[in-house]
Amino acid sequence: MTANDERRKSIDFSEPYAKTGLAILAAKDAPVQSVTDLQAPGRKVVVRLGTTGESWARQNLPKAEIKALDLDTSCVMEVVNGNVDAWVYDQISIMNYQSKHPEKTRALLAPLREESWAVGLRQGDEAKKSLVNETLARMRKDGSFARLADQFMAKERDMMKQQGLPFVFELP
């Protein structure tokens, strides 16, 4: 889950296990090449309700018409059907949905904002937090994250590298 200040009010987080960013799934024919284009008056942007993409869009796209929906698939179909210019969501999801609809969409993966994913934990449970952090550190050190990426996310890793972007498990 994305670790952010709003969520920190009610839960604690482990150390990050991944870094990602918000990206754009644009309709193939929409006049959108970057975030600057989304800031133009009259742009239609869909977001998933309750996500960091929604909060980012509401803060950064004051001239856009923002539509919040409950499901990823509903957001994708708004783009595919040409009802909106773009969807703001995480890079990995944007890549996956674009690959399912290449004839109707484009993925703009340069991050609008970088985010960290971490394990959410009950506030104050330092023992569990320490255990989770130790496990994550061990997985980084022994190559577990790299093996998981090879097995389950090779396409996404390669696509990000082709665009000169760091892969989500490549933490500094």
Language-model region placement:
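Acidic, polar ligand-binding/catalytic clefts
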Residues: 1-39, 105-106, 110-112
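A ligand-binding cleft/hinge motif common to bilobed small-molecule-binding domains
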Residues: 1-10, 55-56, 80-113
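Short beta-strand->loop
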Residues: 12-18, 65-67, 99, 103-113, ...
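Bilobed "Venus flytrap"/periplasmic-binding protein-like clamshell domains
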Residues: 19-77, 91-95
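A bilobed periplasmic-binding-protein/Venus flytrap-type ligand-binding module shared by bacterial periplasmic
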Residues: 23-32, 116-135
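Hydrophobic residues within well-ordered alpha-helices
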Residues: 38, 78-80, 119, 132
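Ligand-binding clefts/hinges and TM-proximal coupling segments of bilobed small-molecule sensing domains
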Residues: 52-67, 136-172
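Short amphipathic alpha-helical coupling segments at ligand-binding clamshell hinges
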Residues: 90, 124-138, 144-148
